[in-house]
From Swiss-Prot:
Family: Belongs to the eukaryotic ribosomal protein eL32 family.
NCBIfam families, per the entry: PRK08562.1 (NF006332)
Pfam families (UniProt xref): Ribosomal_L32e (PF01655)
Subunit and interaction comment: Part of the 50S ribosomal subunit.
GO biological process terms on file: translation
GO MF annotation list: structural constituent of ribosome
This protein's UniProt keywords: Ribonucleoprotein, Ribosomal protein
Organism: Pyrococcus furiosus (strain ATCC 43587 / DSM 3638 / JCM 8422 / Vc1)
InterPro entries documented for this protein: Ribosomal_eL32, Ribosomal_eL32_arc, Ribosomal_eL32_CS, Ribosomal_eL32_sf
GO cellular component, as recorded: cytosolic large ribosomal subunit
Name of this protein: Large ribosomal subunit protein eL32
Amino acid sequence: MDEKEFKRLLRVRARLKRKKPRFLRQEWWRYPKFKNDPKWRRPKGIDSKMRLKLKGKPRSPSIGWSSPKLVRGLHPSGYEEVLVHNVKELEALDPKRQAARIAHTVGKKKRIEIIKRAEELGIKVLNPRV
């Protein structure tokens, strides 16, 4: 796949994501335990209007909402995210298609070393704050 097609697929994914609704579980607004964690759960009740996909009821996830397969799971910049804990893990990355995300357990001193080495290797760091 060439670079032009890859960029086009990233734009298509961004457009699809803008239109995609938040898929929340049935009656998430009704119970406090669902409000705090309103992740998707498939409606299974025999009288469930949402399961029957009736008009006016919240949407359900289906295959049509997915993004193009070649760019699925990538960072919005187009890089594959790789979690890095030290400089050795950083050196195993491919700068053309992978970007580093420094783990939250890494301290300030080691974080500075990783950022410095990433600049030398030409690797993009997604969270470079010091």
